[in-house]
Swiss-Prot record:
GO terms for cellular component: chloroplast; ribonucleoprotein complex; ribosome. Belongs to the bacterial ribosomal protein bL33 family. It comes from Pisum sativum. The gene is rpl33. GO terms for biological process: translation. Keywords: Chloroplast, Plastid, Ribonucleoprotein, Ribosomal protein. InterPro entries: Ribosomal_bL33 (IPR001705), Ribosomal_bL33_CS (IPR018264), Ribosomal_bL33_sf (IPR038584), Ribosomal_zn-bd (IPR011332). It is found in: Plastid, Chloroplast. It holds the Pfam family Ribosomal_L33. NCBIfam families: PRK00504.1, PRK00595.1, rpmG_bact. This is Large ribosomal subunit protein bL33c. Its main location: plastid. GO terms for molecular function: structural constituent of ribosome.
Length: 40
């Protein structure tokens, strides 16, 4: 895949302390992929 596809979402850290995973369309892969939250 060329580059990294990123999605910006707002999340409540109190409700979801674990890593957020979203099934979104990846423009680099041209298909739906699971976009996990990037560890900070």
């Amino acid at each position: 895949s060329r580059g990294i596809s990123r999605y910006i979402t707002k999340k409540n850290r109190h409700n979801t302390p674990s890593r957020l995973e979203l099934r979104k369309f990846c423009p680099f892969c041209c298909k739906h992929m699971i976009h996990a939250e990037i560890k900070k």
